[in-house]
């Protein structure tokens, strides 16, 4: 019991000193030590991208999702969202490359298939969009209907 109390006291003193010493150094003309900066995580960048996407700020979303896949190249969802953001900035060919990467990582990814099909529609490559549609119909009927509507209307 006494060891536990001593440990808690020592931990409290260490915490207090870690808070006070940088302030006293600054007060006496010294510079406070910079706080350690944790590297950005792929998830943090992905979440920033989702916020930018929700705000319809697709250029920022592109940058955020790119950072996410740079940090973690195996992040299929980030590749898919990167494709979505690229498509919404008119960069259809680059969007297709992002969707291809998402599908390499997760071959039966309905959302990536739908978005890829929509990018093909935007590029006027309707035969390729229909090929994607056939594959998507086996995986997700609702997304397949959305893609079918895009093919029909050319949007």
Task: Enumerate the language-model features and the residues they cover.
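Alpha-helical segment of the N-proximal tetratricopeptide repeat
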Residues: 40-71
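Helix-start (N-cap) detector for alpha-helical repeat units in TPR-like alpha-solenoids
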Residues: 42-43, 76-77, 110-111, 144-145
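Position-specific recognition of the canonical hydrophobic site in helix A of tetratricopeptide repeat
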Residues: 46, 53, 70, 80, ...
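Canonical tetratricopeptide repeat
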Residues: 47, 81, 115, 149-150
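Conserved structural position within tetratricopeptide repeats
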Residues: 69-70, 100-104, 137-138
């Amino acid at each position: 019991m006494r060891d536990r109390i001593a440990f808690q006291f020592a931990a409290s003193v260490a915490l207090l000193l870690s808070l006070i010493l940088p302030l006293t150094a600054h007060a006496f003309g010294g510079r406070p030590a910079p706080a350690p900066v944790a590297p950005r995580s792929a998830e943090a960048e992905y979440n920033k991208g989702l916020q930018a996407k929700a705000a319809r700020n697709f250029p920022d979303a592109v940058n955020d999702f790119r950072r996410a896949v740079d940090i973690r190249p195996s992040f299929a969802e980030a590749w898919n969202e990167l494709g979505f953001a690229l498509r919404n900035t008119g960069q259809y060919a680059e969007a297709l490359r992002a969707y291809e990467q998402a599908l390499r990582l997760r071959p039966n990814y309905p959302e990536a298939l739908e978005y890829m099909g929509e990018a093909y529609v935007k590029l006027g490559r309707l035969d390729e969009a229909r090929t994607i549609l056939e594959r998507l119909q086996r995986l997700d009927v609702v997304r397949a209907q959305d893609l079918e509507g895009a093919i029909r209307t050319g949007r």
